Amino acid sequence: MRTSQYLLSTLKETPADAEVISHQLMLRAGMIRKLASGLYTWLPTGLRVLNKVENIVREEMNYAGAIEVSMPVVQPADLWQESGRWEQYGPELLRFVDRGDRPFVLGPTHEEVITDLVRNEISSYKQLPLNFYQIQTKFRDEVRPRFGVMRSREFLMKDAYSFHTTQESLQETYEAMYAAYSRIFSRMGLDFRAVQADTGSIGGNASHEFQVLAQSGEDDIVFSTASDYAANIELAEALAPATGRAAANQPMQLVNTPDARTIAELVEQHGLPIEKTVKTLLVHASEESGHALVALLVRGDHELNEVKAEKLALVASPLTFANEAEIRALVNAGPGSLGPVNLPLPIVADRAVAAMSDFGAGANIDGKHYFGINWERDAALPQIADIRNVIEGDPSPDGKGTLLIKRGIEVGHIFQLGTKYTEALNATVQGEDGRNQLMTMGCYGIGVTRVVAAAIEQNHDERGIIWPDAIAPFQVAILPMNMHKSFRVKEVAERLYDGLRAKGIEVLLDDRKERPGVMFADMELIGIPHTIVIGDRNLDNNEIEYKYRRSGDKLMISVDEIEAFLQAQIAR
């Protein structure tokens, strides 16, 4: 490809509304342009990268035995009503009616459509297992689209759905998809972790996320220093302290704390170590509990894990915190003065709180705290559960090493759905015993557009993008210095361009009448891995300059050897 015949829409300045580096660089490198909030046009450079990501995904899915289909983006509402998600799904589901006043949705996902297809096409256990996938546009009406294509409203996704008659069969496909995903992201040159994850709104049993490590990531991922344990922080187990509870050494005292409405203020004003404080959080209780509110206790330096807490039988789902009026109606004290002593509510204490002694907490009286609280002496030991986020240095749940926490960008997610959708849509097959049985499902997604942004977040410097070779828009850039004034430079550049193309190498020849500085800046911004600089001075020595984008290393290579050299570099 020649730049004179190509849309090279690079920008010198960073657009003001671009928050993260991938969004900034995708705009500056001429990969995307914003059409409306959360909607982007993919320009030629961006589309080349997107197509390469898509091709790797398709190759590995086919290799793993999945079957490609294509399902409509527009879906009839009756399928969503049948599954129950018409009412459950929030405003992210874009609903509309056609000219016949029939309701439809723009598909954010395709569980209903594929389950409907399979229940009509598959009738016997002998036809299973089957794993269908598509690479298709999705639409989610995000309340606040942000970070460019990282969280857009319209995006490209690979979604796969497998159907089985036994859990063993589902497990086999799940493991095959886990392996396929690992190959996909490895081929793309990404530094990623597969982590145990919560199944969330999709539901089901087992679940793993594939997270690309990046400082800008929205997720906290946890992994062990001494094993392959890895989990999303929502799911990572916080073990009980190994030392157990120390003996009581202090009497309980009521202390005036009129200006201490938070743990930080309590610690600062009264010199109490933060690990000797307890936060009391009131949330709405489940109907089965028989109470309006339930108290959750976590140590002052720990954070409540809302995903874990929501799974408690006492807690209403979704988890919602009580407001001040609701709290005062039951306790007659504000949120900053709550504690477990004489609290007339069911209480769940985190494991770390249950192991505390001589601690401080609110007295359920405005402007007062108790110091020196001890379980069983001053307050009954409540229900104990793991309800906090782990922190760095906690012991790994598998007993090997301690935990580290890094930021990650979720690019893939695999689920064992079980019978959630087949039961709702009555998708059955005839089993070996001749009776109808529900199929069990797996679900496997990759955010194709998000992968592009995640790769940039992980691979860039102050000059621009540094693409992994497998997904770079071009493999080689040829920069001929003043080729319009030098016949020799032009001749060598054209010969090299034709030779590389004949070998199947994707090459961009910069034949613009531009200053060398502009040419260098654009190629580094776009992130092409291998750059060839052709100039009269080096040609005097029958040499060409080679530069590797990732390391910045430069070499002088003989004109006669440059094609073979580039082939070897690309094949590495």
From Swiss-Prot:
GO biological process: one example: prolyl-tRNA aminoacylation
PROSITE patterns named among the record's database cross-references: AA_TRNA_LIGASE_II
Superkingdom, taxonomy of origin: Bacteria
Keywords assigned by UniProt, alphabetized: Aminoacyl-tRNA synthetase, ATP-binding, Cytoplasm, Ligase, Nucleotide-binding, Protein biosynthesis
Role played: Catalyzes the attachment of proline to tRNA(Pro) in a two-step reaction: proline is first activated by ATP to form Pro-AMP and then transferred to the acceptor end of tRNA(Pro). As ProRS can inadvertently accommodate and process non-cognate amino acids such as alanine and cysteine, to avoid such errors it has two additional distinct editing activities against alanine. One activity is designated as 'pretransfer' editing and involves the tRNA(Pro)-independent hydrolysis of activated Ala-AMP.
NCBIfam families (UniProt xref): PRK09194.1, proS_fam_II
Known partners and oligomeric status: Homodimer.
Protein name according to UniProt: Proline--tRNA ligase
Species, as recorded: Edwardsiella ictaluri (strain 93-146)
